[in-house]
């Protein structure tokens, strides 16, 4: 992949969907600077769940179990997130990278070396596999990875 790719963590994607100005400014800057935004299925899944959970908490849902019992009230979030991601793809701002077996084989080693949880290790493994050295994130856990440049603003 070219150096113009930047991987976008779910912390930034969630911010975009819940109206966080910092996330919006960061993504706008990256697009204006000519970067192609990249995510994987892990980030898609985390974004979908965290946006749904955030909205449910604002409505008074008390936790994951309560959300699960009332999930039908939030099914609209699935479509809204999917539509916005689809629009970003069609505008050629975003691409979804495959999480293949080669990526998954890298993840345990990366998780152990950098003390990362599973999803974060898969994200970093995706970056390594696709030779992406920039990660837009608000998550400080990634700062310990020595081959990734963290972009926060």
Curated annotation (Swiss-Prot):
Binding site for Mg(2+): 9, 120
UniProt enzyme class: hydrolase
Cofactor(s), by name: Mg(2+)
Keywords: Hydrolase, Magnesium, Metal-binding, Nuclease, Plasmid, Toxin-antitoxin system
Disulfide bonds, paired cysteine numbers: none
Keyword Lipoprotein attributed: no
GO MF assignments: magnesium ion binding; RNA nuclease activity
Occurrences of domain PINc (ranges): 6-152
Family membership: Belongs to the PINc/VapC protein family.
Annotated function: Toxic component of a type II toxin-antitoxin (TA) system. An RNase.
Protein name: Ribonuclease VapC6
Organism: Methanocaldococcus jannaschii (strain ATCC 43067 / DSM 2661 / JAL-1 / JCM 10045 / NBRC 100440) (Methanococcus jannaschii)
């Amino acid at each position: 992949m070219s150096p113009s790719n930047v991987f976008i963590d779910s912390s930034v994607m969630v911010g975009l969907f819940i109206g966080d100005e910092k996330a919006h400014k960061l993504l706008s800057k990256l697009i204006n600077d000519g970067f192609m935004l990249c995510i994987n299925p892990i980030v898609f899944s985390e974004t979908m769940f965290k946006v749904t959970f955030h909205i449910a908490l604002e409505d008074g849902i008390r936790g994951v179990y309560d959300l699960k019992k009332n999930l039908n009230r939030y099914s609209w979030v699935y479509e809204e997130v999917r539509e916005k991601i689809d629009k970003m793809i069609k505008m050629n701002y975003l691409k979804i990278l495959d999480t293949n077996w080669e990526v998954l084989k890298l993840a345990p080693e990366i998780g152990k070396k950098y003390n990362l949880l599973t999803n974060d290790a898969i994200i970093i493994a995706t970056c390594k596999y696709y030779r992406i050295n920039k990660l837009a994130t608000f998550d400080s856990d990634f700062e310990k990875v020595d081959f990734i440049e963290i972009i926060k603003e």
